Amino acid sequence: MNSAYTAIESDVPEQAQQPSAQSNATSAGANVSPSEWTWSQKLKESSHPIALLFYIFFRVSPLFIYLFGTLLIGIITKKNKFILHFIIIVLLVSGDFWNLKNIAGRLLVGLRWWNEVSVIKSTNGEFENVWVFETVDPNRYINPIDSKVFWTLLYVQPAAWVVLGFLALLKFEFLYLLLIIISISLSLTNAMAFTKCDKFGKANHLATDIFSRATGNLFSRLNPFST
């Protein structure tokens, strides 16, 4: 399996990329550290509050519905509770996968990935999977609140599904175990892909920076007019 890498142009104007210290101090209070902010204050400091809210919703709601969905559905109807419960969780897990892969990753941390199938030229019609990674310009401001929430929930959710899967196995709930396996596979796919995308982006930016510095020093030494 191969990997490709490209850069994303910033979709945030330069003037709006990095909030001023004065606005941060005003909204959070002069004597309150960021660690003591309330959730509403942290949400106000987010660069993409709507995207952050949807990200939290899709990450948490499948787990919440798995734990309490039967009770909530039982209030509405007594028929086919398991089928409705199963379908709702599948829809939420699918929505979480799509939102994380296509929207939340790009807006919150400037990362995006997808998988392509290409034909190997040296073989007779054989195919290979290629992971394509995109990352934003390193000069773009990444909000620390958005980044912290993104990476925390990216790894916490699959860990929670693993715990629930172990409990389902102990209870011999094999249909729910099948649902959990699907959820874990989708969640781990995103976690692995974004981790690789982040590493590829950092390595590419580091290599570009080293190359630009090396060529800059070389040209400055060869320049007869340099002092």
UniProtKB/Swiss-Prot annotation:
Keywords of the record, alphabetical order, are: Glycoprotein, Golgi apparatus, Membrane, Transmembrane, Transmembrane helix
Sequence intervals crossing the membrane: 56-76, 83-103, 149-168, 172-194
Bilayer topology reads:
Multi-pass membrane protein
Glycosylated residues, chain numbering: 24
- Locate the compositionally biased regions of type Polar residues: 15-32
> Where does it reside?
Golgi apparatus membrane
Report the Pfam families cross-referenced here. DUF846
Any GO BP annotation: vesicle-mediated transport
Family, per the entry? Belongs to the TVP23 family.
Q: What PANTHER family is this protein classified in?
A: GOLGI APPARATUS MEMBRANE PROTEIN TVP23 (PTHR13019:SF7)
What is the recorded function of this protein according to its Swiss-Prot or TrEMBL entry? Answer: Golgi membrane protein involved in vesicular trafficking.
The protein depicted here goes by the name Golgi apparatus membrane protein TVP23
